[in-house]
Amino acid sequence: MKASYFLASKYAQALLGTLEEKGEISRLDEYVEAFQRLKKALESSESLRDMVYSPLIPPKHIVSRMKDVSEFDDTIFVQFLEVLADKRRQNLIPFMSHILYQESLEREKVVEVRLVLPNEVSNTIINQVKQAIQNKTGRKIKLRTQFNEDLIGGLQLYIGDKFFDYSVKGFLQDIQSAYAPIGGGEIFES
């Protein structure tokens, strides 16, 4: 069966509901980390992926292997893996990992921000950008910085699923698209 983000969200909501019902929602980060370890292992190991997704291997063996890989021996987690394996829904794990991670950020009122700069800058400047975003959003910021020399100057921000381009490269591309020849082609051809 093909993996579906919609179906994965239903399973993730069921897990969240169970955690809330059992009073274990405060341990959500542990579950997120376990799913992320499992996802990473499935992406990096073809033999593990073949074994976990195989319809021929008994679900109990699949659950045992997933539990070992996730390094998380929790009753609710193992029971949830058993449900996934019994229904042959192991292929939803990568989507569920992402959904649970986003839910964890939302519950902690944290926004994940990726800051792309043309070159290295001081921590003071990075902290100023972080503080400005935190003031605008009213949330804690989980900031990751990257460097891309192609930007020439300025910066690019990825805040959640939104993209803000304040780079020289982006400005030049805007100019080019605004003044591009009607027949297409590059305005700055050599």
Curated annotation (Swiss-Prot):
UniProt xrefs under InterPro entries: ATP_synth_OSCP/delta_N_sf, ATPase_OSCP/dsu
GO MF annotation terms: proton-transporting ATP synthase activity, rotational mechanism
Membrane topology reported for the UniProt record: Peripheral membrane protein
Source organism, top-level taxon: Bacteria
Cellular component GO terms held in the UniProt record: plasma membrane; proton-transporting ATP synthase complex
SUPFAM superfamilies per record: N-terminal domain of the delta subunit of the F1F0-ATP synthase (SSF47928)
Keyword line: ATP synthesis, Cell inner membrane, Cell membrane, CF(1), Hydrogen ion transport, Ion transport, Membrane, Transport
Localization (cell): Cell inner membrane
Family affiliation: Belongs to the ATPase delta chain family.
Function, in words: F(1)F(0) ATP synthase produces ATP from ADP in the presence of a proton or sodium gradient. F-type ATPases consist of two structural domains, F(1) containing the extramembraneous catalytic core and F(0) containing the membrane proton channel, linked together by a central stalk and a peripheral stalk. During catalysis, ATP synthesis in the catalytic domain of F(1) is coupled via a rotary mechanism of the central stalk subunits to proton translocation.
Subunit structure: F-type ATPases have 2 components, F(1) - the catalytic core - and F(0) - the membrane proton channel. F(1) has five subunits: alpha(3), beta(3), gamma(1), delta(1), epsilon(1). F(0) has three main subunits: a(1), b(2) and c(10-14). The alpha and beta chains form an alternating ring which encloses part of the gamma chain. F(1) is attached to F(0) by a central stalk formed by the gamma and epsilon chains, while a peripheral stalk is formed by the delta and b chains.
NCBIfam families, A to Z: ATP_synt_delta (TIGR01145)
UniProt-recorded name of the protein: ATP synthase subunit delta
